[in-house]
Amino acid sequence: MDNLLRHLKISKEQITPVVLVVGDPGRVDKIKVVCDSYVDLAYNREYKSVECHYKGQKFLCVSHGVGSAGCAVCFEELCQNGAKVIIRAGSCGSLQPDLIKRGDICICNAAVREDRVSHLLIHGDFPAVGDFDVYDTLNKCAQELNVPVFNGISVSSDMYYPNKIIPSRLEDYSKANAAVVEMELATLMVIGTLRKVKTGGILIVDGCPFKWDEGDFDNNLVPHQLENMIKIALGACAKLATKYA
């Protein structure tokens, strides 16, 4: 047990150069059955790890849980032990409800740092930016599958339920043309840059936080679009695994 990573509970030798990360451990199970084959590795707390085999390539799929503090633990253990590329595939809310609807897919090139962890690692002026090769590969995989996607900036916020004491800033970010909101991508991008690990993100919309009171939210993601997001992410991981082995 001593040679296992403290939280992921896998060994350094089991970490692949390319890793696909998701928030929900249940989504790991949905992803692994799309692969050609897989090997279950570990499940500790919110961190479930599976070795995936897809299109002749091997890479991990690991869940990181909800929010910046827990996901940072996952990302640090991956980055410090051999990961070279990490892609986050997750859900998000639309900040442009007239354009980006529930079930749409967004590939993000950068994120707004409304988390806390990244500000404890580097000054607030430091950007949260993904790697262009990862971003480009995700977009090309979407094109190959004939799946339309949006591109844009995500707001990564530690706050899910707002309080009246301090107003949410999502309206401001919407006016500034940020595309979507989620909770972990900025943390990944900052840690990736600091650790010289390439990062990227692909997200599926579950609703719009501005319209929750109108019923614009469904935790059961649009099934065929969830499948499309998974296939895009897996395809990108396979392509990148040939380059960053």
From Swiss-Prot:
GO biological process: inosine catabolic process; purine nucleotide catabolic process; purine ribonucleoside salvage; uridine catabolic process
Protein residues bound to phosphate: 23-27, 45, 88-91
Active site (record annotation): 206 (proton donor)
Family under the similarity heading: Belongs to the PNP/MTAP phosphorylase family.
Outcome following mutation: residue 47 to A: 790-fold decrease in catalytic efficiency for inosine as substrate. 4000-fold decrease in catalytic efficiency for 5'-methylthioinosine as substrate
UniProtKB keywords: Glycosyltransferase, Purine salvage, Transferase
Free-text disruption phenotype from the record: Severe growth defect in host erythrocytes which is rescued by the addition of exogenous purines. Loss of purine nucleoside phosphorylase activity.
MF terms (GO), sorted A to Z: guanosine phosphorylase activity; purine-nucleoside phosphorylase activity; S-methyl-5-thioadenosine phosphorylase activity; uridine phosphorylase activity
Consequence when changing residue 181 to D: 4-fold decrease in catalytic efficiency with inosine as substrate. Reduced affinity for DADMe-ImmG inhibitor
Amino-acid positions noted as binding a purine D-ribonucleoside in the UniProt annotation, renumbered to this chain: 7, 183-184
Domain of life (superkingdom): Eukaryota
GO cellular component, one term: cytosol
Pathway: Purine metabolism; purine nucleoside salvage
Organism this protein belongs to: Plasmodium falciparum (isolate 3D7)
Disulfide bond positions: none
Name of the protein: Purine nucleoside phosphorylase
EC assignment: 2.4.2.1, 2.4.2.44
Activity regulation info: Inhibited by Immucillin-H and 5'-methylthio-Immucillin-H. Inhibited by 5'-deaza-1'-aza-2c-deoxy-1'-(9-methylene)-Immucilin-G (DADMe-ImmG).
Gene: PNP
Function: As part of the purine salvage pathway, catalyzes the phosphorolytic breakdown of the N-glycosidic bond in the beta-(deoxy)ribonucleoside molecules, with the formation of the corresponding free purine bases and pentose-1-phosphate. Preferentially acts on inosine and guanosine, and to a lesser extent on 2'-deoxyguanosine and guanosine. Also catalyzes the phosphorylation of S-methyl-5'-thioinosine (MTI) to hypoxanthine; MTI is produced by adenosine deaminase (ADA)-mediated breakdown of S-methyl-5'-thioadenosine (MTA), a major by-product of polyamine biosynthesis.
Enzymatic reactions: inosine + phosphate = alpha-D-ribose 1-phosphate + hypoxanthine; guanosine + phosphate = alpha-D-ribose 1-phosphate + guanine; 2'-deoxyguanosine + phosphate = 2-deoxy-alpha-D-ribose 1-phosphate + guanine; 2'-deoxyinosine + phosphate = 2-deoxy-alpha-D-ribose 1-phosphate + hypoxanthine
